[in-house]
UniProtKB/Swiss-Prot annotation:
The gene is pdxT. It comes from the Archaea. This is Pyridoxal 5'-phosphate synthase subunit PdxT. Catalyzes the hydrolysis of glutamine to glutamate and ammonia as part of the biosynthesis of pyridoxal 5'-phosphate. The resulting ammonia molecule is channeled to the active site of PdxS. It comes from Caldivirga maquilingensis (strain ATCC 700844 / DSM 13496 / JCM 10307 / IC-167). Keywords: Glutamine amidotransferase, Hydrolase, Lyase, Pyridoxal phosphate. In the presence of PdxS, forms a dodecamer of heterodimers. Only shows activity in the heterodimer. L-glutamine binds at G52, E53, S54, R116, I143, R144.
Amino acid sequence: MKIGILAVQGDVEEHEYAVKKAMDELGISGDVARVKRIDDLRGLSGIIIPGGESTSIWRLTSKSNLMNALRDEVSNGLPAMGTCAGAIFMAREVKDRIMGETGQGVLGIMNISVVRNFYGRQRESFETTLNIEGIGTVRAVFIRAPAIVKYWGSAKPLVAYGDNYPVVIENNMLALTFHPELTTILVHEWFISNLVKK
């Protein structure tokens, strides 16, 4: 098993640690690889698109065509987990809480609508406890977090928080609007056990 982590910007090391620890807990032998170029997508069993600054990540990857290649791989069945900015990239619809339409580049592969900076800026970041279907109770850290405000088709929420959905699954894709890598390995274990190992 080989799990890739899009390693342009964001919580790359934290995800690496969480994946390695999850593999150990599950008794799985595997590798974690940083994905920076199209060639790095070869041979992956799954990929994680971490949080970070979504516009910067898109800008840094658009010239190399990496995002187009990633879109093709995930559309063809590569299991993918997107956290925070990663959820923004996976969404078919994206708006900003203040600016509205942004024209931001996205993969557009998941039947979800995301609002960037839903809770506000950095100072409105917060933590809460979520009981996620199939995963369990986790401490969720929301940092300048987006919100999934709508889902359709085969997309299914695994938990609701007020009027939005912090975790949504659709086929081979899992989108989270918080940062599981900061507090738990339960989400990474679930991703590996239920989507990657399928």
